[in-house]
């Protein structure tokens, strides 16, 4: 079959390596996001989150992105969307899903798109839980982030201790999972 592409452009599918499907790209403040996620952690709330994330995944595909590596989303929503796409129940790009990331108290994404680990043991247990939910990759939030910074220059402040990060990485690697990290400074 020959397709006449005169006057058109042809390009391969794009790969987006850092996507929070819950984000709109507009400036936000973390505010009281953690309590919002607690309110949404029920069947109706999870359905709403999945609907929003599915729409974001479809926008990626419509923009020419055929593969997305997620960077952490609320309530394991990216895993649910990935599974719906893989099963043919939704249209979207191939998704490499971390589920909900791992942070520490006061860390980037805490309670929104990252669960909180206070000890190395908790971090390892959270990795095992994400593995049980079929996460493709583990996301650690090692330093602060832009939307939860309280002053200029703060986003790169180290939040996660070496011991917590090392325990999460060791557990992930033992389970055969790669690890990605949010690190906005050389300190991280």
Give the label of every model feature segment.
Residues 52-78, 92-103, 135-149, 177-178:
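Divalent metal-dependent hydrolysis catalytic cores, especially in the metallo-beta-lactamase
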Residues 47-48, 72, 117, 159, ...:
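Residue-level marker of alpha-helix boundaries and capping positions
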Residues 80, 121-188:
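Histidine/acidic residue-rich metal-binding segments in metalloenzymes
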Residues 1-11:
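Histidine-rich, glycine-flanked metal-binding segment
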Residues 70-114, 121-126:
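Mid-domain alpha/beta scaffold segments of enzyme catalytic cores
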Residues 7, 15-18, 64, 95, ...:
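Divalent metal-coordination and catalytic microenvironments
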């Amino acid at each position: 079959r020959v397709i006449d592409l005169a006057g058109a452009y042809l390009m391969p599918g794009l790969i987006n390596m850092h996507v929070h499907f819950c984000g709109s790209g507009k400036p936000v403040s973390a505010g009281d996001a953690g309590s919002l996620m607690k309110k949404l952690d029920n069947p109706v709330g999870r359905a709403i989150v999945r609907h929003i994330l599915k729409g974001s995944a479809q926008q990626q595909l419509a923009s020419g992105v055929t593969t997305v590596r997620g960077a952490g989303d609320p309530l394991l929503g990216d895993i649910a969307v990935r599974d719906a796409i893989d099963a043919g129940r939704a249209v979207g790009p191939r998704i490499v899903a971390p589920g909900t990331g791992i942070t520490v108290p006061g860390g980037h994404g805490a309670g929104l798109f990252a669960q909180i680990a206070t000890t190395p043991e908790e971090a390892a247990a959270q990795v095992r839980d994400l593995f049980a939910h079929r996460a493709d990759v583990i996301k650690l939030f090692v330093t602060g982030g832009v939307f939860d910074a309280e002053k200029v220059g703060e986003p790169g402040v180290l939040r996660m201790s070496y011991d917590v990060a090392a325990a999460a990485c060791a557990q992930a690697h033992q389970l055969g999972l790669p690890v990605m990290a949010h690190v906005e400074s050389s300190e991280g």
